[in-house]
Amino acid sequence: MDTKNKRFILTESEIPTTWYNIVADMKNKPRPILHPGTKQPMKAEDLYPIFAKAVSDQEMNQTDAFIEIPEAVREEYKKYRCTPLVRAYGLEKALDTPAHIYFKNESVSPVGSHKLNSALAQAYYCKQEG
């Protein structure tokens, strides 16, 4: 009988305190987003009319690997981040890889946590800016 843990659920104290920005760690950075009017690389300021300043700054950030999650957002995450992390032992075996592969089981959240994770943060920053 297989006794390995397959499902992992974070406690409230284990909820991340930072977002990970993969671009900061990429050796080859993605091509810049081009301004639709000028066709020149966009700056964070170009996004301010559309998004909250903090969201725009984070979107264009290529240097900080970790971005602090505001306490108020983390408190809201505690209500909604209950989706389990599942270890894909079968896939690891099929791929014959020593890597540990995990996936989030979003079937327990009707809207999918990625939507709430993003929406809560965007609403927080918009509220901060008035």
Feature locations, PLM:
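PLP-dependent amino-acid enzyme catalytic core
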Residues: 1-130
